Amino acid sequence: MSSPRRDHALQCLREDRIMAVLRQIPEEHLVPIADVLVAGGVRSLEITHDYERATADVALLVERFGDKASVGVGTTWTVEQAESASAAGATFCVLPGVDVETARRSADLGMLTLPGVQTPAEIQTAIKSGADVLKFFPANPPGPTWLAQVAPAYQQRPFMATGGVTVDNMAAFFDAGAIAVGMADTLFGDFADLSRAREMIAAAVDVARAS
């Protein structure tokens, strides 16, 4: 089911091929590192829903970037978290695993829905639950070989590899069938060192664009 938010989130993810995972970034550092990411070519910004300020941070970045970025929520465990993220303007909702009720609610709310999977059974459950993109998590281990073996059997949904992805192995995940990768500190390093973050982001974006 198409929606403007879902379509925008999928477009950003397909075009940039990287989702930045912003896990518990201190308040004073969130906007600066988000600015560097978006300026550097990474528009998909995931705020993990594992700290008190998460929903407010989603709203903050949605207001700051508008349609210049795709701001969503990750580490989503409950229907209530999905609903609060949607109300804050989130364009996508990432789950660590397959929670059928939460995934279905996310899809119903018009957010791009990305449940975490690692087995064929989980993949099939995720698809039935409304998954738009299958988050291969953790991705390394088992590594890109697993994805290359499984992805051809589930061509009706794209994969994003997250967890253990680095600038050195991300191309292998693209070659294995992932449309995108999710990366946290392996993408930008120390969020307080913006100069180094720019260099690291540029290196990852170069790999994504060349793959």
Predicted regions and their residues:
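Hydrophobic, well-structured mid-protein blocks that either form specific transmembrane helices
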Residues: 80-122, 126
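CoA-thioester-processing core
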Residues: 113, 143-154, 161
